[in-house]
Every structure is written in C-alpha cells, then in structure tokens.
Amino acid sequence: FRMELVAASPDIGQPMNLAFDERGRLWVTSTLEYPYPAPLGQRGRDTIKLLEDTNGDGAYDKLTTFADGLNIPTGIYPYRDGEVAWSIPNIWFLRDTDGDGRADKREKLYGPLGFERDTHGMQSSFTRGLDGWLHLTHGFNNTTTVNAADGSSITMNSGNTYRVQLDGSSV
C-alpha cells in the first residue's frame, strides 16, 4: 500500500473525524476548541471541511468550509444533501439546500446531550448500520439522555454504543 498526505495545516487544523460520501468527497472535522468547549450560547470556532477532486486526477483540489461555528464536532455522517454531525450539545442535520457546498440549514435531531464532565466522552464514530439506523458511540464519564420525537429515550453513563434514526424520530 501507499500512504499519501491529502490535507494538512493550515487547511485542516486539528482534525477530529473524517468520512467519505458516495461521490468520493472527503469530509473532515477540524477543531480549535478541543478539549475546552466554547461556552454554551457562544459560537464555536470549529468546522467541517469538504474536500473534492473536481478534475478526476485522484487528488483533492477544492476545499470548502461546509459548516462553521461548531463546538468540538467529534462525529459526522454524510447524509442526503449534507451531514449528520455532533456539535456540543446537539446532534444536527446540516444541509446544503442550494448546492454550493456550504450548510445553509441546521436542524437539531437530538439534544441537548451531556458533555460537561469530559469532552473525551461525547458522541462519535457515526456509522450507518445494516439495519438502516445510525450507530454511535458515547464515550466515558458523561451522563446523557437521548430523547426522540416518538417519545423513546435512553440514558447512558460512560462507554456505550447506541442507535438513532437519521430523521430524529426514534432511539
């Protein structure tokens, strides 16, 4: 195998997570906040960057800031016209409705969720399961109750995996 650098500072600073979509684009979370979150109610300084190969040569030649103002985005999953992403204290669906590569709509799917005790123990590893649900990890040392639109809920404390519907309807 061969290892190649595809993105680095200053374009991508302190990457936390990455994911590929069906078009081969690379989505990368970048943080300045970690490990100290921005205070609630204040805009975070973290981003999700979108890297694209626009000329088909196998190298990323376009970098777009898909979403900014985020707060330690440790989990992402490309979905439809955007990303399902964790940004303290919620799981969001960030959408690009006009096709310019930038999120212009933000819909809260789940939250607020716990993060106060330790930013190492938040929502991450967003993976679509064979069952069609989004599977996530919930790290250690935080207590989190996830409530869904249908009234279902779970409470977790330290080290869990769980699943949610991508539309916020069920957990």
Label for each model-derived stretch:
Residues 1-171:
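Beta-propeller domains with acidic blade repeats across secreted/periplasmic ectodomains
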